[in-house]
Amino acid sequence: MAAPTYYTITFGCQMNRADTERMAGILESLGYVATEDELQADLVLYNTCTIRDNAEQKVYSYLGIQAQRKRKNPAIKLIVAGCVAQQEGEKLLRRVPELDLVMGPQYVNRLGDLLAQVEAGNQVVATDPVEIPEDITKPRRDSQVTAWINVIYGCNERCTYCIVPRVRGQEQSRQPQAIRAEIEDVARAGYREVTLLGQNIDAYGRDLDPKTNLASLLRFVHSVEGIERIRFATSHPRYFTEELITTCAELPKVCEHFHIPFQAGSNEVLKRMRRGYTHERYRQIIQLIRQYMPEAAISADAIVGFPGETEAQFQETLQLVQDIGFDQVNTAAYSPRPGTPAAEWPDQVPEEEKSDRLQRLNRLVAEVAAARSARLLGQVQEVLVEGPNPKNPRQAMGRTRGNRLVFFEGDPEELQGSLVPVRITATRAFSLTGEAVTVRASGP
C-alpha cells in the first residue's frame, strides 16, 4: 500500500516558513510523503498570513478548489494553520465546512496530536492560547545549507496596525540549551548557516527565569562547531541595544546584516503606529552599527499610506531612506486589518494615493540599493553557496555575509555548502555577479 502524500503551501514571513518545515517534519514522522501535486495529495496544509488582505484572499481561493476535491473524496484531509486560522477560528469552518483542522501558530508542535483527533472523526479547531512545547521531531527543511531556528514565539507589542500579537500570542522564549541543541543538530546534518527567528527577536529572554537577552544567546551558540554563519531576524528598534551591536561586532560568525524595520520616517506617524521610538533613535541605532561594523548591510520594512499620513510625512520616509542608505527595504501600502485600532480610524488614505507613494518609495529604494551594490564592484566577497541559479543551472548561487545574492560560474552541486571567495564583476540593486577566485573546501 502506497504511503499517504501531503502538500504544503506557505504564505507570509520566515516564521511561517520555519513553522511549515516543522509541520512537514511531523507529517513525515507519521508516514506521510511529500508531493508537488496539490490536486493529488491525501493531506493539504495551508500555513496562512493575515498581514496583507491579498494573502488572505489567496487562501480562500485555494480552499475553494480543495473543498471541491474533498466533496468528491471525503478521505482527503484539509488543514488551515497559521495566522488566518488563529484569527478566524470556527468562522473558517462555517465558511469552508470541508475543513478537518483549523490550528493557530501556537499549535505547530502539536500537529500529530491534532491529526489523531481528526482520524477519530472529529473536526478540530485549536486556537486557544497554550504554552508552546519543545518538539523533538526534526523539521523537513527546504534548504540543505541554511536552517531557520525559532528562538522566540509571539509578540508583546501593540502596534495599532498589526494583528500579529492577537494571532501569535504573547512572547514565549525558548530555553538557550534547547536552541543550542537544535543548532548542534543541524550542524551535524551538514548545515553551514543558521538564522535565529522571532517576531521581535531582540526581545528574546526577557520572559525567562532567569532573564537573559539576545546578546547572551549569540555568545552561547557561537561556539557550535560546523556552523560558519549566524543571522537573526526580525529586530525591533526598541530593543536593539549597544550591547547587542558590540556583541555582533565581536563574534566573527555573526553576519554583518541586520533587518530592522523602521515603518515610517515621521515621528507623528510612528507615534500613531505606537512603535515606541523616533526616527532620531532609529538613525542613532544605524550610526552605532556602522561605527562598529562600517560595511554592515541594513534592510528594513516600511509602510506607506498609514491613516492620516500627509505628503509631508511621507517625504520624511523618503528622506530617511535616502539618509540611511538601505541595502533593501520591504515596502507595502497600508492594509487595514480587522480588529486593529488603525482600521477603524476615519482618516484613511485613498488607495490611489497609497499606490502612488508606494511606487515613489520603491523607485528610491532601488536607486539607493543600486548605489550600495555598486560599492562592491571589484571587491572579493565571501559567498556561501546555496545551490544553482534557478534561471541558469550552470551558475552557482549564494549569499554574501551582507545577504546580497551572488551568481557566478561553477558547479552548484560540487560547491553547495562551500564558502567561496568571489570577485564581483557586475552589480544590480539586489544582486551581484562575479567570478570565483579560489574555493574553500566544505566542512567535514
UniProtKB/Swiss-Prot annotation:
Family matches, as InterPro entries: Elp3/MiaA/NifB-like_rSAM, Methylthiotransferase, Methylthiotransferase_CS, Methylthiotransferase_N, Methylthiotransferase_N_sf, MiaB_methiolase, rSAM, rSAM_horseshoe
Binding site for [4Fe-4S] cluster 1: 13, 49, 83
Record-linked CDD domains: Radical_SAM (cd01335)
Residue ranges annotated for the Radical SAM core domain, each copy included: 141-372
Sequence ranges assigned to domain TRAM in this UniProt record: 374-438
Substrates-to-products reaction catalysed: N(6)-dimethylallyladenosine(37) in tRNA + (sulfur carrier)-SH + AH2 + 2 S-adenosyl-L-methionine = 2-methylsulfanyl-N(6)-dimethylallyladenosine(37) in tRNA + (sulfur carrier)-H + 5'-deoxyadenosine + L-methionine + A + S-adenosyl-L-homocysteine + 2 H(+)
Annotated GO biological process: tRNA methylthiolation
UniProt keyword annotation of S-adenosyl-L-methionine present: yes
Localization terms from the record: Cytoplasm
Binding positions for [4Fe-4S] cluster 2 per the UniProt entry: 155, 159, 162
UniProt KW keywords: 4Fe-4S, Cytoplasm, Iron, Iron-sulfur, Metal-binding, S-adenosyl-L-methionine, Transferase, tRNA processing
Cofactors (names): [4Fe-4S] cluster
Pfam families, per the entry: Radical_SAM, TRAM, UPF0004
Function: Catalyzes the methylthiolation of N6-(dimethylallyl)adenosine (i(6)A), leading to the formation of 2-methylthio-N6-(dimethylallyl)adenosine (ms(2)i(6)A) at position 37 in tRNAs that read codons beginning with uridine.
Protein name: tRNA-2-methylthio-N(6)-dimethylallyladenosine synthase
Lineage of producing organism: Bacteria, Bacillati, Cyanobacteriota, Cyanophyceae, Synechococcales
Gene: miaB
